[in-house]
């Protein structure tokens, strides 16, 4: 039981690594919290630092969720992997290393799915990018994909999976509550990752 609690803490700490902040400060001398939306996530990194930094941060945030979800498998623990994934997402959203001001749960949640249900991850990736290229709203694409993840979990039938996806979707939508207002008011910025924004 001790190792389980220890690894849950590790999963949270792993999720707490603010890659957007690290990449911004080390690679560009910029505190990304002071630019754009101030969010420590891939979208704000794309918009503030450019495509290269955005890809690095997004992939790193995805891998946080993937590695954390895989911890019980690596250590042969008889406990549901999604608990560790949830801990990582919690860390990403409320990171102890960045004064509990983190991202919006999207990339790290995707990483959780990549480890636990890779086929569903692939399907949802198609949903996300189809919406993104159609609407150019990252926030809307993220929220709709989160809802699609809940539907996919219901089809799957695993009760823990359903609960986990409901929690993750709820977190994603909650963290995008300001974006919802801007989408309604038509003031939400659309995606443009072709160049670094000044």
From Swiss-Prot:
EC number(s) given by UniProt:
2.3.1.275
> What Pfam families does the entry give?
G3P_acyltransf
- Primary location: membrane
Q: Name one GO molecular function term.
A: acyl-phosphate glycerol-3-phosphate acyltransferase activity
Tell me a GO cellular component: plasma membrane
PANTHER family membership: GLYCEROL-3-PHOSPHATE ACYLTRANSFERASE-RELATED (PTHR30309:SF0), INNER MEMBRANE PROTEIN YGIH (PTHR30309)
> What does this protein do, in the record's words?
Catalyzes the transfer of an acyl group from acyl-phosphate (acyl-PO(4)) to glycerol-3-phosphate (G3P) to form lysophosphatidic acid (LPA). This enzyme utilizes acyl-phosphate as fatty acyl donor, but not acyl-CoA or acyl-ACP.
Designated name of the protein: Glycerol-3-phosphate acyltransferase
Its gene name is plsY
């Amino acid at each position: 039981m001790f190792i389980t609690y220890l690894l849950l803490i590790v999963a949270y700490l792993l999720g707490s690594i603010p890659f957007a902040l690290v990449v911004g400060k080390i690679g560009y001398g910029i505190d990304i919290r002071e630019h754009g939306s101030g969010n420590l996530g891939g979208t704000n990194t794309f918009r503030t630092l450019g495509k290269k930094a955005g890809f690095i941060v997004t992939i790193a945030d995805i891998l946080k969720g993937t590695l954390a979800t895989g911890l019980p498998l690596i250590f042969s623990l008889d406990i549901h992997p999604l608990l560790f994934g949830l801990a990582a997402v919690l860390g990403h959203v409320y990171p102890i290393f960045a004064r509990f001001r983190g991202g919006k749960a999207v990339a790290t949640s995707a990483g959780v799915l990549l480890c636990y249900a890779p086929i569903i991850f692939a399907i949802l990736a198609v949903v996300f990018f189809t919406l993104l290229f159609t609407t150019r709203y990252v926030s809307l694409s993220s929220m709709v994909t989160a809802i699609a993840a809940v539907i996919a979990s219901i089809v799957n039938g695993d009760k823990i999976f359903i609960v986990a996806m409901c929690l993750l979707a709820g977190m994603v939508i909650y963290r995008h509550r300001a974006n919802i207002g801007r989408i309604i008011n038509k003031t939400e910025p659309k995606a443009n990752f072709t160049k670094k924004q000044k």
